[in-house]
């Protein structure tokens, strides 16, 4: 395999292919081609940034003017608009508007969504009824609903992932020493 993601896909396929698991590459040209308009509107019109700026409710994640990275030959760097050009940070790569338009049309697989766009991209290529996430993911998914509304994309039901707390015997003894039990921990520090 040429990349870690390719190796993981092959490994998962070998392990679970008989169970009907489908493994695909979200960076494939065909999937990225399906979001060319999303890429264009973000890069040329800063649509997501404008939605964020006009919203009373701000996202917990910083929303950039351009929310895509450019990928090529091991490089994955932010795209920024500087005067009349688009530059790829930490590289010598730059595009005029016409060159960027051509690159989006010819090589959409080179555009990688950042954390803000990933949620939207994920729902556009493989819509889910429910998204199960950790505490931080739930918070930022909920703050991104306005972006889904802008693109008329289905917003999934957000469900917090179940979690568990394991108390070591040492911690258990410390709690007992102070006359506390597990429930006391969840009452907040001012109520202990």
Question: Language-model segments: which ranges?
Answer:
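N-terminal targeting/trafficking signals and adjacent low-complexity tails
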Residues: 1-192
